[in-house]
Amino acid sequence: MSQDPFQEREAEKYANPIPSREFILEHLTKREKPASRDELAVELHIEGEEQLEGLRRRLRAMERDGQLVFTRRQCYALPERLDLVKGTVIGHRDGYGFLRVEGRKDDLYLSSEQMKTCIHGDQVLAQPLGADRKGRREARIVRVLVPKTSQIVGRYFTEAGVGFVVPDDSRLSFDILIPPDQIMGARMGFVVVVELTQRPTRRTKAVGKIVEVLGDNMGTGMAVDIALRTHEIPYIWPQAVEQQVAGLKEEVPEEAKAGRVDLRDLPLVTIDGEDARDFDDAVYCEKKRGGGWRLWVAIADVSYYVRPPTPLDREARNRGTSVYFPSQVIPMLPEVLSNGLCSLNPQVDRLCMVCEMTVSSKGRLTGYKFYEAVMSSHARLTYTKVWHILQGDQDLREQYAPLVKHLEELHNLYKVLDKAREERGGISFESEEAKFIFNAERRIERIEQTQRNDAHKLIEECMILANISAARFVEKAKEPALFRIHDKPSTEAITSFRSVLAELGLELPGGNKPEPRDYAELLESVADRPDAEMLQTMLLRSMKQAIYDPENRGHFGLALQSYAHFTSPIRRYPDLTLHRAIKYLLAKEQGHQGNTTETGGYHYSMEEMLQLGQHCSMAERRADEATRDVADWLKCDFMLDQVGNVFKGVISSVTGFGFFVRLDDLFIDGLVHVSSLDNDYYRFDQVGQRLMGESSGQTYRLGDRVEVRVEAVNMDERKIDFSLISSERAPRNVGKTAREKAKKGDAGKKGGKRCQVGKKVNFEPDSAFRGEKKTKPKAAKKDARKAKKPSAKTQKIAAATKAKRAAKKKVAE
């Protein structure tokens, strides 16, 4: 006891003090293995029955609080030294929950009793247990490592004179008591923001104070406000950031242009959506005399203005990404940068990072180089305009006559790159998205279906090519950077997906380890089916989520060995860090020393990159969840006016309690509950993804066409209830796979389509996307020398531009 630094504190509390909790933990830390209570009593010099009883109670309390674990061998151990798992608690409206462990496919079940020791969003240390009666693997919470401290949004109510808030997030299945002096004038039914002052425990209720009253009129704006607070998305600019950007001017300073390649006369153009406000990429393409193309991709030079460790950079890092809600945007950067200095607006000088590439007539990336430049966009084009120009719209072709030839070359390049993607087996998703059209009250007036055309796709292929080049550049230099990682699907996910496909009469080829091309063939084979969109969604769900990581493992979906995000530094922090790394390497090639450069280059450590990868991946998921919440609310709000109306749709998911239907053209899902079906007992076949009536034999399967009536909409829970009017059996075995078609068409030949297209490789079958061959060291050295400076063509353009501007300046003087 004499060595216990908290001995005096314990003596004040107890007549016969025992060692403090801190001292016991320190003692066990120094010990090589767990200790029994008797061993601890001897080692801590505990004497007498009273002290032994005190030690027993203290150890039990420490076990209860998660500071110690009582093992099967009747010993006390530190949790971190045992086979415990760290994870995030996912609550459920019915009181129980799950533990999501990183790197583990299946979540662990948390009983309602366990959920009394934690809340949704907590990061905890837990002990995996056996399975419960329903076969669910359980876990026991050992310790809350990082408690959820964010504010909670909910509605304020009073009952019998007691005020309380019911959280809007149903995963928080507890009410929060509000003392009378902490209500901030909130009235019954008002939406409020609460800060917890006392977390719920097994014995006590949660207590909090209202810190903000949002009002009682639930609209689109409030739905966004709730999502921002629920998902802890930063949306207020700190004062230090406001002060920093206040000094920025509207025009690029002349000194910033010095030393850069002048591309202002190169007809670079931006191509974006009609409602886009920030333009971070511009493109130009021309045919090479010897065949193939030269492609310039110019990206806004955000790294020049946003540098670590300034307040602006700290906030951009904290946000991680811009968040695009249907009705508004929460930008990663202040508007003076995102829509101003960094945005490649037409006819104004802008700083940029350029990736200049050469592409062969077969779509091979034959060379690339990076450099800092100054540019002036020659036009702000939209996908719709470019598509109409390519389709022959005479008015638009006359309006943009100087650019038509360049746009046609871009389109020619796209067709070759698209073919190269197909040959290497990259998966192309032809997604149809819902676009909300709002009225003056910011409610959805109608939902329109948007489809991608070749203008969207050509920009996508140009960006992918620049991203590949950037990834290779930093990887070759062994510079720490964030790669965009898309891991292979797990064996369990593949098996589950195949089970569903089999029920629909379809097959995923590729054996135990299907390659990207196998998924691409499947999508091609179902493209004409009425349930193609649903099948594509299922395919996406069977795959792993893409993340950011400095350890490159390739991108499965794109069938690429190296891929990184380079093209959107205005709205994605990983792109900004990649720009800094590239600038650092360019300066290093010129003999620069130090971790920073004059124009914003920066050398990150691997440890910094690991932390950034985790943070940026989290920020991306956070943004997705928030925008999904708002979209779900908007859809429910829209469907309020549709109650009683009849729609057609397709069964998109089947569960034991019913099936979900996705309405045609609206992309809105609702539930047909099993209790609303014909009078029968329905059995859920998980493998076959169907509900089967025991008496009637009526079956409802994934992909079935149905007609439903909208019965009810629950705005609080974001739920829509349908009732079934009629059903129609989904097509089975419609459309052979591309492999089967090739096999049938090439009967009697030695090889089919698969043999012609690709060799068995890891991710990158096509040589178009491989690195330089090691058998040609001279060519490699030549390419390396070229990469250090812009091409002769670019230098010629820059020199002519410089001379022209110098002449103008002389005349002016």
Swiss-Prot record:
Cell compartments where the protein resides: Cytoplasm
Positions of post-translational N6-acetyllysine modification: K544
Pfam families per record: CSD2 (PF17876), HTH_12 (PF08461), OB_RNB (PF08206), RNB (PF00773), S1 (PF00575)
Basic residues: bias regions: 775-791, 802-813
SUPFAM superfamilies per UniProt: Nucleic acid-binding proteins
Basic and acidic residues biased stretches: 737-749, 761-774
Reactions mediated catalytically: Exonucleolytic cleavage in the 3'- to 5'-direction to yield nucleoside 5'-phosphates
Keywords annotated in UniProt: Acetylation, Cytoplasm, Exonuclease, Hydrolase, Nuclease, RNA-binding, Virulence
Listed name of the protein: Ribonuclease R
Organism this protein belongs to: Shigella flexneri
Gene name, Swiss-Prot/TrEMBL: rnr
